[in-house]
Amino acid sequence: MEDVPWHRITTTYGRATDFPQYFKIMWDMENITDVKTALCEVTNNIEHQSTLWHATPFAMIFLKRIFERAVSIINQNECADYIVEYLLDFFELIAECFLDGDDMEHPQQLEHFSDMIKEKYLLSEEYDEEEDEIYYEDEETFSEELFYSFWYYSYQVVAACRPMLKKLENSSSQHWSLKAKEFHLL
C-alpha cells in the first residue's frame, strides 16, 4: 500500500490521502458502521457519474483484495457479507463504466499499470488547495492515454475477480450463487 503515493493522486473530491486508513478498516472487518463508512468514502471518491479518477485503478486493487478476503469468510462475519454484497454491485458499475466507452474511439492505455504514477502524472508533494483547484480546472490535466488508463486498468482489476465470482457461483448459499451469476459483465 505504501508504494502508491495516495496523497498525490486525484479523487472525485480531492486527493486519496486517507485511503490507506479506509482500506485497513475494511480489511479488519470489525465494525459494520465503520466498514460502511469506509466503503462509501472510497467508492464515492473513485467513481462519480461514470467518471473514474487517478486513484480508481489503485483503489480497485485493494478493494479486490478486501473482496477476496471477505468471500473467504462470508457467512461468518457480518462485515464480510456486507462487503461482498456492496463490492459486487460496485465492481459491476466499474465494468459498466469501462464497457460503455470501450467501443468508442479512444487512445491506447499506458503500457504498464505503474506508468500511471510516474512523477509527471502526480500532484505536488505538498497539498495546496489553490494549486489543486487550478490543476482540476485545466482541461489538459490528464493526457488522453493516462485518462483512458483509469478505465482500462480498473476494468482489468474487476476482470481479475473472475475466480472469486466462480467460487461464489458454486457456493452452497443460493443468495451468493445467484448474486454472482447476475454479474454478467465479465
Give names to the regions the model predicted.
Residues 1-37:
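N-terminal "cap/leader" segments of large eukaryotic alpha-helical scaffolds
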Residues 32-45, 88-91:
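HEAT-repeat alpha-solenoid elements in large eukaryotic scaffold proteins
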Residues 15-20, 55-60, 154-162:
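Core helices of alpha-solenoid repeat scaffolds
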